[in-house]
């Protein structure tokens, strides 16, 4: 039985992609009434009538307590928890449209795993800047959370990070379902960096797999990838312990190893010799988050003087035209050093 500290709350999940739709189901299964916002009215109508999201989560039936709308004002009205399921590079412009519709004391929960291009801001910083919300009102949900597995009710755990521990506990209580176990912490920086950087490492693992490399290579990329994520985190003031937890190693392993991972799958196509454009076409026009984040994180690391060789290699493949063979040689030919 799930322990509850607060009463059930009203939740708005803004974004009907695979993860947003899944979390709407989780919040509903936890006993809450949920507003799920879809950008396209045609998709909202389809979900309302069929109780299924055929575009992003086919085969999963949503509870009747998930109310679907394409009207942002209706979705946000009076909700005490607002879950932002918007891609990282679209978050700023979308929030400009919504900021006056959000309740002044609502807890804002970010799902986006990325670093904003050009500004190099984390998503919680973008939310605070655009909405004017105090950082203590902004939480981050991150962990080894492959959407379809969770939507199917397979057991999983996640992290709710917020500067205000009580707000983190409020979200924890609201999203805890029999198959979904949330933990809390107050390290927003580390939680966000783990989520953003793992997409880049997952691209590297996918590239290696597509190139024909085996499990030794995959394990090496994951462990050395974690090391460089932790170095960046330390330089930015994160708690090093975060990277050994669900938002660090947990998310990294799931994303780097599963064929359900969009970033790993995208990288696999690059490793097999497809161009970025070919890989994009094969994934219905979607660019993996790690492709964009590789540039932001690379620039961030250079600015802070942090060594991130795997990120540098992925950046070179995605943005500078480096061949995969060159990427492998560059990583293996680096100067020798202690672990």
Swiss-Prot record:
One of its GO terms (cellular component) is cytosol. NADPH binds at residues 18-19, 39-40, 113, 147, 262, 287, 289. Pathway: Membrane lipid metabolism; glycerophospholipid metabolism. Sn-glycerol 3-phosphate binds at residues 113, 143, 198, 251, 261-263. Its EC number is 1.1.1.94. It is found in: Cytoplasm. Keywords: Cytoplasm, Lipid biosynthesis, Lipid metabolism, NAD, NADP, Nucleotide-binding, Oxidoreductase, Phospholipid biosynthesis, Phospholipid metabolism. Its main location: cytoplasm. Transmembrane segments: none annotated. It comes from the Bacteria. One of its GO terms (molecular function) is glycerol-3-phosphate dehydrogenase [NAD(P)+] activity. SUPFAM superfamilies: 6-phosphogluconate dehydrogenase C-terminal domain-like (SSF48179), NAD(P)-binding Rossmann-fold domains (SSF51735). It holds the Pfam family NAD_Gly3P_dh_C. InterPro entries: 6-PGluconate_DH-like_C_sf, 6PGD_dom2, G3P_DH_NAD-dep, G3P_DH_NAD-dep_C, G3P_DH_NAD-dep_N, NAD(P)-bd_dom_sf. It catalyses: sn-glycerol 3-phosphate + NAD(+) = dihydroxyacetone phosphate + NADH + H(+); sn-glycerol 3-phosphate + NADP(+) = dihydroxyacetone phosphate + NADPH + H(+). GO terms for biological process: carbohydrate metabolic process; glycerol-3-phosphate biosynthetic process; glycerol-3-phosphate catabolic process; glycerophospholipid metabolic process; phospholipid biosynthetic process. The active site is at residue 198. Belongs to the NAD-dependent glycerol-3-phosphate dehydrogenase family. Catalyzes the reduction of the glycolytic intermediate dihydroxyacetone phosphate (DHAP) to sn-glycerol 3-phosphate (G3P), the key precursor for phospholipid synthesis. HAMAP family: NAD_Glyc3P_dehydrog (MF_00394). This is Glycerol-3-phosphate dehydrogenase [NAD(P)+]. It comes from Corynebacterium efficiens (strain DSM 44549 / YS-314 / AJ 12310 / JCM 11189 / NBRC 100395).
């Amino acid at each position: 039985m799930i322990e509850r500290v607060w009463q059930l709350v009203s939740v708005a999940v803004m974004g009907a992609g695979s993860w947003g739709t899944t979390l709407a189901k989780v919040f509903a299964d936890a006993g809450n009434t949920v507003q799920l916002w879809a950008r396209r009215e045609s998709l909202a109508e389809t979900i309302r009538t069929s109780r299924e999201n055929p575009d992003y989560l086919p085969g999963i039936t949503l509870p009747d307590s998930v109310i679907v709308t394409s009207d942002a004002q209706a979705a946000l009205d009076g909700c005490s928890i607002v879950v932002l399921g918007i891609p990282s590079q679209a978050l700023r412009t979308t929030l400009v449209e919504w900021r006056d519709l959000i309740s002044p004391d609502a807890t804002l929960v970010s799902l986006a795993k990325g670093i904003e291009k050009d500004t190099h801001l984390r998503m919680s910083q973008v939310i605070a800047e655009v909405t004017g919300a105090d950082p203590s009102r902004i939480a981050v949900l991150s962990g080894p959370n492959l959407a379809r597995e969770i939507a199917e009710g397979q057991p999983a755990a996640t992290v709710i990070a917020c500067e205000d521990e009580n707000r983190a506990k409020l979200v924890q209580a609201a999203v805890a379902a029999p198959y979904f176990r949330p933990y809390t912490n107050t390290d927003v920086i580390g939680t966000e960096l783990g989520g953003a950087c793992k997409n880049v490492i997952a691209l590297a693992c996918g590239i290696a797999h597509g190139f024909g490399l085996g499990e030794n290579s995959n394990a090496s990329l994951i462990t050395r990838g974690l090391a460089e994520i932790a170095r960046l985190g330390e330089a930015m003031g994160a708690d090093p312990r975060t990277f050994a937890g669900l938002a660090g190693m947990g998310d990294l392993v799931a994303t780097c190893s599963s064929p359900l991972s969009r970033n790993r799958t995208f990288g696999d196509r690059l490793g097999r010799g497809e161009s970025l454009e070919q890989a994009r076409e094969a994934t219905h026009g979607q660019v993996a988050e790690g492709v964009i984040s590789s540039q932001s994180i690379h620039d961030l690391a250079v600015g802070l003087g942090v060594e991130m060789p795997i990120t540098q290699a992925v950046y070179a493949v995605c943005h500078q035209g480096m061949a995969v063979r060159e990427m492998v040689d560059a990583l293996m030919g680096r100067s020798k050093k202690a672990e």
